Amino acid sequence: VQLSDHVPPRLPEIPGHPLASRVPMEPDVEPVAALLGAAQDAVDPDAAPIDLDDLRSRMVGLRSWSRRQVVIVPTEADGTARADAAPIAWIALEDRARGRTDLQSVIAPDAPAREALSAALIAWAVEVGGSFARHRGVDSTQLSIDIDVRDADRAAQLAAGGLEKVRTWLHMRRGVLAQEADSLPGPRPGVRVRPVHLHPSGLPVAQDVRSVHRMLEESFADHFSSYRESFAEFSQRLVESPEEADWELWWIAEIDHDGDGAWLPAGGLVASTRPAHETGHGRVGEGTYLDYLGVHRSARGHGVAKALLRAAIADAARRGRDHVDLEVDADSPTSADGLYRSMGWETCERTQSWHLDVPPHPSRLLEPETEDENA
């Protein structure tokens, strides 16, 4: 079965190189992974390899349900997209949350009319973002994409498409020593950290999942580009890939404000496992990645963040891991980067966020385009 998006990108006419778009299918996953890997290696040869299972889920698995995406391929003689051709480009838009659309794309370095093709795909991203905004009933949605600061090629494409560089993120790494399994300081009096409670099935107790979600939402409310992710959206992302959820790497910090033994949630930490991999400079061992760390605003100043971080470090040491990684806003309003440096983290790379606010538009399926829209 070969399918086209109902409102596909308007691709440039390239003499001698006719192109068309179609919906991704299973055979496209490995060629797209190769494109992503080559683009990544061009700027960061030490990066972890592309996770093929994760990409497969995004392109043709459960995660594809929240995305609109196409691959670009050569055409058949009749102008339709070739079903058996390896993609030369891929673009995906995820309806992440109310007012937030995540963008991911790649174009082969030798693709014909590459700049024109990039412009066409970004224009389609704006089209798709506008449809998401209409469906959500919001005034706009924010197209968002993160790139390596060294990726000048991608930065030029995004700037030409109207996106703006808005933030820099520090990716930090801390080595782990075996003795840190039981040598780190404990939490302050009145603070404790525990893993989320698990059922015999291995799944977490619902109350703890909701507590972690609430702590993260409340803690990030005053951060840059913060957006509300409902619990339904949060849990849906977990359900999409339950095998990837490292429930043993979820922690809740609790605080006893009045000293009466009434422990209440004060912060949450969600982490995941980073497999060992080879790089251009040798092997990187297995590590822990801190996906989300949040402290409720009412609990700041009690050492909650340090307690959560130490819990993750000690756990990594017990598992024989050699590092703990995280990402932080270079201009964090809570100066979190300073805390991480004081605890041994060092910056290993930087990325940038590029954004574009897109207004909603009428449905192209139900209403014809106006002359202005088609200009």
Feature names for model-found ranges:
Residues 37-137, 147, 261-287:
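Conserved donor-binding loop and adjoining core beta-sheet/short helix segment
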Residues 255, 269-273, 292-297, 304, ...:
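Active-site proximal loops enriched in glycine and acidic residues that flank catalytic Cys/His/Asp
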Residues 2, 146-181, 310-375:
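Active-site/acyl-donor-binding loops of N-acyltransferases
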Residues 182-288:
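Flexible, substrate/cofactor-facing loop regions flanked by secondary structure
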Residues 223-224, 247, 261-269, 277-289, ...:
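Extended hydrophobic-aromatic, low-complexity segments
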Residues 114-131, 292-295, 301-318, 337-342:
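Conserved acetyl-CoA-binding loop-helix of GNAT-fold acetyltransferases
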Residues 1-56, 186-229, 365-375:
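Short amphipathic alpha-helix that is part of the acyltransferase structural core
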Residues 1-12, 95-100, 107-198, 352-356:
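Acyl-donor-binding surface of acyltransferase catalytic domains
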